[in-house]
Curated annotation (Swiss-Prot):
Positions bearing Pentaglycyl murein peptidoglycan amidated threonine: 1331
Taxonomic path: Bacteria, Bacillati, Bacillota, Bacilli, Bacillales
Gene Ontology cellular component list: extracellular region
Quaternary structure annotation from Swiss-Prot or TrEMBL: Interacts with host DSG1; this interaction increases S.aureus adherence to keratinocytes.
Subcellular localization, as worded in the UniProt entry: Secreted, Cell wall
Residues annotated as domain CNA-B: 569-680, 681-791, 792-901, 902-1012, 1013-1123
Biased composition (Polar residues): 62-71, 94-109, 146-155, 163-173, 860-869, 972-981
Protein name: Serine-aspartate repeat-containing protein D
């Protein structure tokens, strides 16, 4: 994690979460649990050295790893599990299923599991270089002057892929015989404490320590010719530089920088994959002690993984042959720089060459999201090496609406350190998809069945959880590099919502969530000494109605290496181990013993030549020894250990040499000086029994108690072991050393410890709950403990409603049910919780003697009554918290009383006559006003009405906030609200809020004043001159119906005009109304709004608004139509652009019976679908119904009735000019047969062909069938040829201009037979008006006049038709 305060890199790299979906686990191999320390160096290991390098499993030729005091987090293997929870979250269940077969590799040692397999993500083997130097047959001066080549060119190019190299050794005998010795590289098994102290000092202080016991781990030196040093020219020691000089220009390097896809899934992810830096460095001989060179890396690179302590793995460069430091490392992580400062090694040796092989990491802080072609570069000296990679972060785990991601972001592990086992951090992204989740819960658990050596743990003692809320739309770093300053810390909001489980788990209840959260879990490792620990932690997000999303993270361990080479030397060493089976031979599973002193003496001179202390894994190494015989002595053995038998078996590398032995160094290291020791073990224990007679002594009939926990501790109180008694009450601690121990017995549930040491027989009496046991060369089976069953008692009584508030239970007062009562012990710890029953009773059972605290929760709406009011503790109230004592009997005296305090709310409703919003002395209350009381949720609680004085009151109310609503009384209007400063005198309006807080609230008033009423009306008159205005001579019309509607269209009044035409509506409020006049029979509506004067007619329907005044301006006029001289011009202009095809088929049957009186009734009904009714009745009774339906919907109905009793020139000019581009073809074929019987024998053949062609470009097809029946009876001898040519040329942009100017002058009418019915365009029969009567004295002139008029009309249409054609 990057420390953003001081810009110092602390740690950052965590594992990126799943590559599979729903449930995945990432397995890393990290840190120093398998420390493969060393360098890609010059000289190789001999065969014996390879064997000596093994720790506990030499026969397997496999390097094993001891527990590290300081595990580092390096690079990890990726191992995944996939799980999909198919259960809905309502059940809150999880199922974990493992997939895949992987093996965890820790250094060279594997962890094999049935369902998990992993490969070492960053396992570095020590590489040794080859030397082609061959010895000359004899030494020459030239040879002596030759510069020492620590490594030839070939040595600078080891097989980096194989991590192995072969050494061509020099001759090893004095006769200069050539011997080619080849050896493969191996790894040295060490514990991390071996590299801790010195490495940290070097990193921090750039110092060089020569303390062997504290030295960094170096490799055994390579096999070399005996006299090789005689051929080396050691440079004269030069004085150190007076000041440090940058010698980057004197450094040459051959470097590779490789992106490593650790899990080989073709996806590169920071902290999951890594960079491999390998370089062979040549140092110019001009370089002096104190000079330095640098390694600079780009900001996309960082030099340690999850563990900030791992930085020491990129530390000093040492010569593995003699352990000398060539250059010390100093890190400047803020500037991405490593500075290497040379020691005097470069002053004493020429042609120094060094090799480094580091795993370095990608910095997710600078790579927040997936990105292609990200550059990584490292500059060693002045040479820069670059590489690029496409970074592809995995997606979050998403299952329906649930989404989650997680990674370990910091781990510091100290294996074998009980006081400080280390810690780790996991960062979890909760709901990164920002979905709306219901009942969202996050479960974090440090457990997986496939990882039994999991050293993670989660519990409230060691775990700290931080929770941050992510702003909407914020982009989270996909490498889990979180800047918490940009987030909101909401940890305190969720502290009470974190529940820790017994199985190393914690559950965080987020409730309903619609944003993302970052959860950081910081917890400690479990103490472990395992050589192959793993860390696994699972996370699961669940919510209602969605499947859970789960994943996990896992870690394993390995390390880095670097080094250089110089003069080869010899070493003595090997191993001190605990020989558990005491057979004197090292076997698999037997561990090393640390802190044993090893001293080496020259066996010839008895001079001490070296000393070492075994490391924690039991290994030791004493360097810089020439060939010869040496005595090796072991001392300072751990207390209580004894030496195993020596020289057992025939393998000197596996047997024990004893406390003192002589070994020989002859041209190679001798790593066979071992010592086996063992510790004698003893047992401690005995018996736990039920002491039924409570005498503290085991009797024959008393039986053991099974399942009792017994704990063994050392003298310092540290827990060593825990066991439980068996079915017979027996227990035993085994494999114990001599010493003093503490034994603690846990009191079994329901029991009480018996008397301690009652008798003189220590094997039969009880030692109590805690005792001391001593082991001194023998078992101790005397530690017993007795218990008897604890008697149980009850505590409780009663919770009642103290209606009279006197603090005592009265016979009429009843219990309160559902009251929560809590029982606590003297320490305040909750023991039980219960609720009172329906009668107010409660009881706690199964209690032992003791003092208890009882707490009563005040029920909602109640107040505790007074405490201890009487002398009878059985009926008085003990209050909400009291103490109860149980002493060998039940205690049923703990009571608590409560009462309900109630209050009133109300005041006054008055008539505010002056409308000032304030109650005045002379203003009186309004009775009968409805007042409603509601709670805060608008639920109606009560309704009252004001009394005769305007007062109202709501009683028996609890504390709280209420709403009061006043209903406006009929005929009143609410006055102004809160006009004054006196809340008790002003008006609170129709709706107000009242608060009751331990007192009545009588301040809620409402004032009203009487609403003024208004009138509406005026006049309906006979408009004799039809000018639309009332003239002084025109009179009113009586009994005209007038209807009044409100704004909603509801009828609220109906009246009729009086004898003077007047009407009126009274008692109206201000508002909008509609007045409707019903037209009197036989009258016609006069023109409306002809002037702005209020004397004009307003029409049949009038909208009017009354605003604080009467309105007497609503008039209407009617006139009677003149029946003698009807001059009617009806212009119907309708523009409708309507294309209509109108076929007008008109069958006209003209039957004419001509007596001497000829009634020629030519009734032609021509229907052309345009609702244009031109009905013209002349003497010839010609009904021309031109019904042309064009989409113009224009109804022009021109009815002109001309009676034969009047002289009327019926000049019917029907001009239906409807411009609609409407080509309406109307073929009106009218066959008119006129049969006329007359005294003068005249046949009147009225043949009327009506051809109506109307072309109308109209999209609507209108078929107009018109049947025209022309029956004419005439008494005259006339040949009536009725040739009716009707051309209906409807050219209508819906411009229908129908001028029906009927001027009909009829003198006398010949009596005619009236026609009974005709058909309109709705096919409904209707009677036609008669055109004359028998007493009119009419002659045939009318008939002929009508015929001529009709003929003229036909000719006009015919002419138009021809023109159209």
């Amino acid at each position: 994690m990057l420390n953003r305060e001081n810009k110092t890199a602390i740690t950052r790299k965590g594992m990126v979460s799943n590559r599979l979906n729903k449930f995945s686990i990432r397995k890393y191999t990290v840190g120093t649990a398998s420390i493969l320390v060393g360098t890609t160096l010059i000289f190789g290991l001999g065969n014996q050295e390879a064997k000596a390098a093994e720790s506990t499993n030499k026969e397997l030729n496999e390097a094993t790893t001891s527990a590290s005091d300081n595990q580092s987090s390096d690079k990890v293997d990726m191992q995944q599990l996939n799980q999909e929870d198919n259960t809905k979250n309502d059940n809150q269940k999880e199922m974990v299923s493992s997939q895949g077969n992987e093996t965890t590799s820790n250094g060279n040692k594997s962890i094999e599991k049935e369902s998990v397999q992993s490969t070492t993500g960053n396992k570095v083997e020590v590489s040794t270089a080859k030397s082609d130097e061959q010895a000359s047959p004899k030494s020459t001066n030239e040879d002596l002057n030759t510069k020492q080549t620590i490594s030839n060119q070939e040595a600078l190019q080891p097989d980096l892929q194989e991590n192995k190299s072969v050494v061509n050794a020099q001759p090893t005998n004095e006769e200069n015989k050539k011997v080619d010795a080849k050896t493969e590289s191996t790894t040295l098994n060490v514990k991390s404490d071996a590299i801790k102290s010195n490495a940290e000092t070097l990193v921090d202080n750039n110092s060089n320590s020569n303390n062997e016991n504290n030295a960094d781990i170096i490799l055994p030196k390579s096999t070399a010719p005996k006299r090789l040093n005689t051929r080396m020219r050691i440079a004269a020691v030069q004085p150190s530089s007076t000041e440090a000089k940058n010698v980057n220009d004197l450094i040459t390097s051959n470097t590779t920088l490789t992106v490593v896809d650790a899990d080989k899934n073709n996806k590169i992810v920071p902290a999951q994959d890594y960079l491999e830096l390998k370089s062979q460095i040549k140092v110019d001989d001009k370089v002096k002690s104190g000079d330095y060179f640098t390694i600079k890396y780009s900001d996309t690179v960082q030099v340690y993984g999850l563990n900030p302590e791992d930085i020491k793995n990129i530390g000093d460069i040492k010569d593995p042959n003699n352990g000398e430091t060539i250059a010390t490392a100093k890190h400047d992580t803020a500037n991405n720089l490593i500075t290497y400062t040379f020691t005097d090694y470069v002053d004493r040796f020429n042609s120094v060459q060094m090799g480094i092989n580091y795993s370095i990491y990608m910095d997710a802080d600078t790579i927040p999201v997936s990105k292609n072609d990200v550059e990584f570069n490292v500059t060693i000296g002045n040479t820069t090496t670059k590489t690029t990679a496409n970074i592809q972060y995995p997606d979050y785990v998403v299952n329906e609406k649930n989404s989650i991601g997680s990674a370990f972001t910091e781990t510091v592990s100290h294996v074998g350190n009980k006081e400080n086992p280390g810690y780790y951090k996991q960062t979890i992204y909760v709901n990164p998809s920002e979905n709306s989740l219901t009942n969202a819960k996050l479960k974090v658990q440090a457990y997986h069945s496939s990882y039994p050596n999991n050293i993670g743990q989660i519990n409230k003692e060691v775990t700290d959880i931080k929770i941050y809320q992510v702003p909407k739309g914020y982009t989270l770093n996909k490498g889990y590099d979180v800047n918490t300053k940009e987030l909101t810390d909401v940890t305190n909001q969720y502290l009470q919502k974190i529940t820790y489980g017994d199985n190393n788990s914690a559950v965080i209840d987020f409730g309903n969530a619609d944003s993302a959260y970052v959860v950081m879990v910081n917890t400690k490792f479990q103490y472990t000494t395992s050589e192959s620990p793993t860390l696994v932690q699972m996370v699961t997000l669940s919510s209602n109605n969605s499947k859970s999303a789960s994943m996990g993270n896992a870690l394993g361990f390995t390390n880095n290496q670097s080094g250089g080479a110089g003069q080869e030397v010899y070493k003595i060493g090997n191993y001190v181990w605990e020989d558990t089976n005491k057979n004197g031979v090292q076997e698999l599973g037997e561990k090393g013993v640390g802190n044993v002193t090893v001293t080496v003496f020259d066996n010839n001179t008895n001079t001490k030549v070296g000393e070492a202390v075994t490391k924690e894994d039991g290994s030791y190494l004493i360097p810089n020894l020439p060939n010869g015989d040496y005595r090796v002595e072991f001392s300072n053995l751990p207390k209580g250990y004894e030496v195993t038998p020596s020289k057992q078996g025939n393998n000197e590398e596996l047997d024990s040499n004893g406390l003192s032995s002589v070994i020989t160094v002859n041209g190679k290291d001798n790593l066979s000086a071992d010592l086996g020791i063992y510790k004698p073990k003893y047992n401690l224990g005995d018996y736990v029994w039920e002491d039924t007679n409570k005498n503290g002594i085991q009797d024959q009939d008393e039986k053991g108690i099974s399942g009792v926990t017994v704990t063994l501790k050392d003298e310092n109180g540290n827990v060593l072991k825990t066991v439980t008694t068996d079915a017979d009450g027996k227990y035993k601690f085994t494999d114990l050393d001599n010493g003093n121990y503490k034994v603690e017995f846990t009191t079994p549930e329901g029991y009480t410890p018996t008397t301690v040491t009652s008798g003189s027989d220590i094997e039969k009496d009880s030692n109590g709950l805690t005792t001391t046991g001593v082991i001194n060369g023998a078992d101790n089976m005397t530690l017993d403990s007795g218990f008897y069953k604890t008697p149980k008692y009850n505590l409780g009584n009663y919770v009642w409603e103290d209606t009279n508030k006197d603090g005592k239970q009265d016979s009429t007062e009843k219990g309160i049910s559902g009251v929560t009562v809590t029982l606590k012990n003297e320490n305040g710890e909750v023991l039980q919780t219960t609720k009172t029953d329906k009668d107010g009773k409660y009881q706690f059972t199964g209690l032992e003697n003791g003092t208890y605290k009882v707490e009563f929760e005040t029920p909602s709406g109640y107040t505790p009554t007074q405490v201890g009011s009487g002398t009878d503790e059985g009926i008085d109230s003990n209050g909400t918290s009291t103490t109860g004592v149980i002493k060998d009997k039940d205690n049923d005296t703990i009571d608590s009383g409560f009462y309900k305090p109630t209050y009133n709310l109300g005041d006054y409703v008055w008539e505010d006559t002056n409308k000032n919003g304030v109650q005045d002395k002379d203003e009186k209350g309004i009775s009968g006003v409805t007042v409603t009381l509601k709670d805060e949720n608008d639920k109606v609680l009560k309704t009252v009405t004001t009394d005769e004085n305007g007062k109202y009151q709501f009683t028996d109310l609890n504390n709280g906030t209420y709403k009061v609503e006043f209903e406006t009384p009929s005929g009143y209007t609410p006055t102004s609200v809160t006009s004054g400063n006196d809340t008790e005198k002003d008006s609170n309006g129709l709706t107000t809020t009242g608060v009751i807080k331990d007192a009545d609230n009588m301040t809620l008033d409402s004032g009203f004043y009487k609403t003024p009423k208004y009138s509406l009306g005026d006049y309906v008159w006979y408009d004799s001159n039809k000018d639309g205005k009332q003239d002084s001579t025109e009179k009113g019309i009586k009994d005209v119906k007038v209807t009044l509607l409100n704004e909603k269209g509801e009828v609220i009044g109906t009246t009729k005009t009086d004898e003077n035409g007047k009407y009126r509506f009274d008692n109206l409020d201000s508002g909008k109304y509609k007045v409707i006049f019903e037209k009197p029979a036989g009258l016609t509506q006069t023109g409306t709004n002809t002037t702005e004067d209020d004397k004009d007619a307003d029409g049949g329907e009038v909208d009017v608004t009354i605003t604080d005044h009467d309105d007497f301006t609503l008039d209407n006029g009617y006139f009677e139509e003149d029946t003698s001289d009807s001059d009617s011009d009806s212009d119907s202009d309708s523009d409708s652009d309507s294309d209509s095809d109108s076929d007008s088929d008109s069958d006209s049957d003209s039957d004419s019976d001509s007596d001497s009186d000829s009634d020629s009734d030519s009734d032609s009904d021509s229907d052309s679908d345009s609702d244009s009714d031109s009905d013209s009745d002349s003497d010839s009774d010609s009904d021309s119904d031109s019904d042309s339906d064009s989409d113009s919907d224009s109804d022009s109905d021109s009815d002109s009735d001309s009676d034969s009793d009047s002289d009327s020139d019926s000049d019917s000019d029907s001009d239906s000019d409807s411009d609609s581009d409407s080509d309406s073809e109307s073929d009106s074929d009218s066959d008119s047969d006129s049969d006329s019987d007359s005294d003068s024998d005249s046949d009147s053949d009225s043949d009327s062909d009506s051809d109506s062609d109307s072309d109308s470009d109209s999209d609507s097809d209108s078929d107009s069938d018109s049947d025209s029946d022309s029956d004419s009876d005439s008494d005259s001898d006339s040949d009536s040829d009725s040739d009716s040519d009707s051309d209906s040329d409807s050219d209508s942009d819906s411009d229908s201009d129908s001028d029906s100017d009927s001027d009909s002058d009829a003198g006398k009418h010949t009596p005619v037979k009236p026609m009974s019915t005709t058909k309109d365009h709705h096919n409904k029969a209707k009677a036609l008006p008669e055109t004359g009567n028998e007493n009119s004295g009419s002659n045939n002139a009318t008939l002929f006049g009508g015929l001529f008029a009709a003929l003229g009309s036909l000719l006009l249409f015919g002419r138009r038709k021809k023109q159209n054609k």
